[in-house]
């Protein structure tokens, strides 16, 4: 037993010695590392060199770095933020659009702009009213400017009207004279004839057609339309009492198609007399040969023109006679009143 105790004690002492040696080596290594770091710091920082540089009038390295940064900031260009695109949407809500619309409407009264500060309509004229009022007070009115402005405005308005008239004339010349459609359905010499053509509005044929059709009724009167009853009277006898009873049975209402056919189906065709037909033929012949002006010149000495002239003179003489008669009555009444 004594030997075992001795062996255990020796082993324990040997382990403690090994641990102490390890701790000693670790502490020595730490001290060596700290000493090396202190040496490096001492080598980087030399206060004597710094003092010498300051005495010579130099600038320290920190100040040089600050100056370099300041110079770079001066020479650097101003950044351009216009190319930056925002990710936010520019869509307006309904309330924003309504508010913007109301604000724009409140700025105008009709076609006149309103001042936002005073709420009055802005003066859009170029006339200085205050200067004119002062000149009127002093007795030296200067209305030349206003007169010149009025003259200029009248000239511009007249020039615009002339330009419009010229443009309308040019358009009419390019488009040509206005044409009208002539469609005639008539019976002549026992035959049904239908003519459809386009003629100038100012032509003799168009005038003759309008004059001839004004005297002819192409539509039927209400008497030609057959009368349709809506109810029918029916008399029946009662077999028990032998009494007669009058019943009214409603008929079927005619449709719109039946009404249209009844009105247009029985319509009479337009009838032209030989005189009216010859007038239309003569007007078309005059337009084809372009002899309207020649006929006007030669017809001045004709019988019909002379009769028209005499009738005009007679009507004018009658008017003058009636006027003189009325004046005489008025003069007599005035004399009686006196």
From Swiss-Prot:
Q: Where in the numbering of this chain does the BCNT-C domain appear?
A: 251-331
Residue spans of biased composition, Acidic residues class = 34-46
Q: Where is this region: Disordered?
A: 1-102, 153-174
The Gene Ontology CC terms held by the record are: Swr1 complex
Sorted alphabetically, which Pfam families does this protein's record hold?
BCNT
Highest taxon, organism lineage: Eukaryota
Write out the annotated subcellular location.
Answer: Nucleus
Q: Where's it mainly located?
A: nucleus
Skewed-composition ranges (Polar residues):
83-93
Q: What family does this belong to?
A: Belongs to the SWC5 family.
Q: What biological function has been recorded for the protein in this entry?
A: Component of the SWR1 complex which mediates the ATP-dependent exchange of histone H2A for the H2A variant HZT1 leading to transcriptional regulation of selected genes by chromatin remodeling. Involved in chromosome stability.
Quaternary structure and partners: Component of the SWR1 chromatin remodeling complex.
Protein name (record): SWR1-complex protein 5
Task: Tell me what organism the protein belongs to.
Answer: Candida albicans (strain SC5314 / ATCC MYA-2876)
């Amino acid at each position: 037993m004594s030997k075992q105790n001795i062996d255990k004690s020796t082993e324990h002492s040997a382990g403690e010695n090994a641990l102490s040696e390890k701790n000693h080596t670790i502490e020595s290594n730490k001290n060596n590392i700290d000493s090396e770091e202190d040496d490096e710091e001492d080598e980087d920082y030399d206060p004597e060199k710094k003092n010498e540089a300051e005495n010579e009038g130099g600038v320290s390295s920190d100040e040089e770095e600050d100056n370099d940064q300041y110079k770079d900031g001066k020479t650097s260009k101003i950044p351009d933020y216009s190319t930056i695109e925002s990710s936010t949407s520019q869509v307006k809500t309904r309330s924003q659009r309504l508010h913007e619309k109301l604000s724009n409407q409140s700025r105008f009264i009709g076609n006149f702009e309103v001042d936002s500060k005073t709420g009055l309509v802005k003066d859009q004229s170029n006339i200085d009213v205050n200067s004119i009022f002062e000149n009127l007070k002093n007795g030296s009115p200067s209305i030349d400017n206003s007169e010149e402005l009025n003259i200029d405005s009248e000239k511009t308005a007249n020039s615009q009207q002339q330009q419009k008239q010229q443009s309308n004339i040019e358009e009419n010349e390019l488009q040509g004279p206005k044409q009208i459609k002539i469609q005639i359905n008539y019976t002549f010499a026992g035959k049904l004839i239908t003519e459809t053509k386009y003629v100038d509005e100012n032509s003799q044929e168009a005038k003759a057609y309008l004059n001839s059709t004004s005297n002819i009724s192409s539509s039927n009167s209400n008497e030609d339309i057959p009368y349709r009853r809506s109810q029918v009277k029916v008399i029946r006898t009662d077999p028990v009492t032998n009494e007669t009873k009058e019943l009214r049975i409603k008929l079927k209402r005619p449709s719109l198609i039946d009404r249209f056919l009844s009105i247009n189906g029985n319509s009479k065709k337009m009838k032209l007399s030989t005189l009216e037909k010859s007038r239309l033929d003569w007007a078309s012949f005059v337009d084809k040969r372009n002899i309207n002006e020649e006929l006007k010149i030669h017809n001045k000495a004709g019988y019909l023109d002379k009769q028209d002239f005499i009738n005009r003179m007679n009507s004018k003489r009658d008017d003058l006679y009636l006027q003189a008669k009325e004046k005489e009555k008025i003069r007599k009444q005035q004399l009686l009143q006196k």
